[in-house]
């Protein structure tokens, strides 16, 4: 088997946000270990800021961009040549001309709240199904088949969320026979924030998850806890092809041993959600104020 692997994700540099870095660093270090990653991503970024310097770390990796139109009024307006209202464009404009007053924004948002609620209702239940990347699927499958043929791909790798990534991987596997590795960065239909609260949409998302476990040649999870969750959900049927691959620290960012500080730090990495409230902080404060702290592991 050759070492040509197709990495499929809508989240890749120059985008810079939490969902980017698992696939991004995987690509970087696969290349160093003798693999030949080829990336398939989106050609438009509507929601995230960008850092073009990130691409310097994967300069020699082929990156293909399949056509993606956001299924929103914004996506339609931009497609028809309207103003670029992506987050990166708005942020750049704000830096140039200055942000508007908060009072003006508040009045505007109040006036639009009724329409906004109706608009979101339509999007969540009828348009963005199974998610907002639904209109990326067709072009990604078409381009993916071409890449598989031209680069003699031996493995397809997708990372979820979004659910659409799994649909793309599944279709490419069925169309080409190439082995498919389905990665889960989140416990999808188990975690409330990850799936739709509208049952017909949730049912479609659940079906995608079920088919993923059924047809993927291997399942990988960001956390060992996720694999335990999936093992319980599917009664152990897929445990023989499920693997835990943690998201590690990029060694290039670590200081040399000689330059490391002697002090130890406790660092929280990730999102601290509103739902967490202050439970962790209370426990942490008690631990810090206790008479003894024990450390375990490598420092």
Report residues per predicted region:
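N-terminal subdomain of nucleotide-sugar transferases
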Residues: 1-80, 85, 218, 227, ...
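A conserved catalytic-core segment of Leloir-type glycosyltransferases
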Residues: 42-134, 138
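Short N-terminal targeting/anchoring amphipathic segment
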Residues: 92-99, 144-165, 177-181
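Membrane-proximal helix-turn-helix segments that form the acceptor-binding/catalytic region
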Residues: 142-145, 164-167, 171-175, 200-219
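Nucleotide-sugar donor phosphate/pyrophosphate-binding loop at the beta->alpha transition
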Residues: 176-181, 190-211, 251
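A short, active-site helix/loop in glycosyltransferases that binds the activated sugar's phosphate group
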Residues: 211-241
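Carbohydrate-associated surface elements
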Residues: 225, 245-248
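Conserved catalytic-core segment of nucleotide-activated headgroup transferases in glycan assembly
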Residues: 250-299
């Amino acid at each position: 088997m050759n070492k040509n692997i197709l990495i499929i994700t809508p989240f890749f540099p120059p985008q810079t946000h939490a969902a980017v870095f698992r696939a991004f660093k995987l690509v970087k270090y696969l290349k160093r270990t003798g693999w030949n990653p080829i990336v398939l991503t989106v050609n438009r970024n509507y929601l995230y800021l960008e850092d073009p310097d990130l691409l310097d770390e994967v300069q020699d990796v082929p990156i293909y961009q399949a056509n993606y139109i956001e299924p929103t009024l914004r996506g339609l307006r931009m497609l028809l040549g309207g103003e670029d209202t992506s987050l990166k464009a708005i942020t750049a404009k704000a830096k140039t001309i200055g942000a508007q007053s908060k009072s003006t924004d508040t009045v505007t948002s109040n006036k639009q709240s009724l329409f906004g609620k109706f608009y979101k209702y339509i999007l969540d239940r009828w348009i963005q199904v199974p998610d907002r990347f639904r209109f990326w699927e067709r072009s990604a499958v078409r381009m993916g088949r071409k890449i598989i043929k031209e680069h003699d791909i031996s493995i397809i790798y997708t990372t979820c969320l979004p659910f659409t990534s799994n649909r793309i991987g599944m279709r490419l596997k069925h169309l080409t026979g190439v082995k498919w590795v389905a990665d889960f960065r989140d416990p999808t239909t188990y975690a409330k924030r990850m799936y739709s609260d509208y049952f017909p949409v949730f049912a479609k998302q659940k079906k995608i998850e079920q088919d993923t476990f059924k047809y993927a040649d291997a399942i990988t999870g960001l956390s060992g806890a996720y694999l335990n969750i999936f093992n319980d959900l599917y009664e152990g049927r897929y445990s023989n092809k499920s693997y835990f691959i943690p998201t590690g620290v990029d060694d290039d960012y670590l200081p040399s041993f000689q330059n490391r500080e002697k002090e130890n730090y406790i660092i929280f990495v990730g999102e601290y959600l509103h739902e967490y409230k202050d439970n962790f902080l209370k426990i942490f404060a008690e631990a810090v104020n206790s008479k003894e702290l024990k450390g375990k592991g490598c420092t």
